[in-house]
Amino acid sequence: MKSTEQKIYGRNACLSFAKSSPKTVIRAYCTEENRGRLGSLLKFLASQKRAYHIVSSDDLNKICESEHHEGVCLLVERMQPGDETQLLKDLQAVPKIGSNLLLCLDGITNPHNLGAITRTAAHFGIKKIFLCNIPVESQKSLVSGAFHRTAEGGAVHVELYCSAEGKSALEALKKQHGWNVFATSSYGRSQSLHKISFPQKLILVMGSESQGVSDSILQIADSKVCINGTGHVESLNVASATAILLNEYARQKENYRSAVSRPTAIPTRAVRAEGRNRKGS
């Protein structure tokens, strides 16, 4: 496998990728049981004179270096996250009205957490994830086969961006474009999630389970948010915490939409009074 290529495995991940980006598929491997599910992709590969192989599950274990392939593996052109410059450029095109959220993951590199969070983001319609404070040597391995399998196809609906830093980009979005930074924290003056009103242009920062949100980003946060619990455990898994926060964001966003689109009712008494005035005129 070349450095410009990567393997994606897992049925939902492969089917979503094959549907959205068939031209980037170099080669396909699948068991006989999954041949029908990949029918359109296999026909496309054959028309482009690209190879596909029907193999046993044991062979796929070796190809994927994992037993969690669900009978399907694709060799594709490597997906690389965008950088800070691309993030700022893309966010300038975001509509100025309505609710917008940028999900920022601070120092999170575990592929299973990243995949689970990406799946959740896709479910709630979040379009962009910014991975910040990621060491350069770790950036190339973030978008792995394990990441795609855990994302269950969500990765094709979410754009990823990555930086070894992150504070400067968030500051630029705050000062130049009016975004608000909300960071999760269990310490200090954190507000309960259920008492928070999310702004229309929101950067939601999630920290790693071992380190939390970095001090440099906490310093520029407009608000700190916590999820109240029993205290029996120190914290939630970051993927679980993200799901809870995004659900609350989606709830507030839906309420905002309903309030904006709901027609204003004229009180009954006012209508009657208006009618009497017309009769007397």
Segment roles from a protein language model:
Residues 182-232:
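Active-site/ligand-binding-proximal alpha/beta "capping" segment
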Residues 33, 57-59, 134-136, 209-211, ...:
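Short, acidic/turn-prone active-site loops that include or flank metal/cofactor-
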Residues 56, 77, 106, 132-133, ...:
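Short beta->alpha connector loops at strand-helix junctions that form conserved
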Residues 16-19, 23, 30, 91-191:
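RNA substrate-binding interface of SAM-dependent RNA methyltransferases
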Residues 37-38, 136-146, 211-217:
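Short, glycine/polar-rich helix-capping loops at beta-to-alpha or helix-loop-helix junctions
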Residues 1-93, 259-281:
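N-terminal positively charged helical leader segments and presequences
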Residues 15, 123, 146-154, 215-267:
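Structured adenosyl-cofactor binding patch, chiefly the S-adenosyl-L-methionine
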Residues 10, 106, 113, 235-237:
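Active-site helix-initiating loop/hinge in glycosyltransferases
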